[in-house]
Amino acid sequence: RDSFTVEGLTDKQIVKYQKDFWSTLNDRNKVSKNILLNHHVRPVTVGEKKVLRIDVPAADRHDKPVYIGTDPMKGTYKRDYEGDFLCTEEAVRAMFADQRDISGDVEVLDEFGLDVLNQDTIKGYRIIFEQLHSGHPWNALENDEFLMKLRAAAKNKNGTLSPTIAGLLFFGDAYHITEVFPNYFLDYREECDDKAVRWLFRTHSNEGDWSGNIYDFFCKVRTRIDDDVAVPFANRRNGYRVDRVDVHDALEEALANALAHANYYGRRGILVVKNGKELSISNPGTIRVTKEEFYAGGNSDPRNP
């Protein structure tokens, strides 16, 4: 217990184990997909003993889930610390959803009309859009055409307009969004160290006095997280004081990324917590690039672009 002894393998055993391993790995009734290459399986020497080393690379999202047998719901496992644990059906379905290169957020929701979109949100968004793009030809379009240009709406099977998933999330009302995403929930809290006080301020998507969509949530929360960022008095551009610093942009980008990369089919929602000078943002779903690509930067793969 708590130790092991290297017994080693003979050359004959190594050849047999390699043959058995590759035979099993390439049998689609036993393993769904072989993602290993020859260099992943090789004999090495430990001390004076020969052993067979097998390196298992992380599967690309296009290949996940890799599972044992023929049923992904019963044969998909995840390595966690010292053990292999059966993945939940929810996690397996999320892997299948992430295989697509065409973003799922452009899927047309045939069962809805554009009346499920919040007109105040659309109006507010168009005002900001026009301020940022004053000469843009889309500013002259009617709302329906504008939404189609944004890919927030598209023609359904009957030839009429319906929102896309992106359009519903971005412009819809929360009670319509939860018809498609039952666990959709956006939550922002301002907390303090006083345990007797649950929070100093809170807003969430189910309050009912605002839309609860991700655009309005972003607008509400960005003003709250920006407020406490100190701006040096000497922060000027072309002789005029500028009330923004790089930290503002970083915080807003973090919030936008949490909304853009979230798996809204997941079991939990998005939680943003501000406590003094600390800010934590959590969302459902894993990143779709490798850890090395994430730290290297330059390779974005958003779930909901």
Task: Name the predicted role of every residue range.
Residues 250:
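Conserved N-box helix within the HATPase_c
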Residues 1-247, 255-305:
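Conserved N-terminal catalytic/coupling substructures associated with nucleotide/phosphate chemistry
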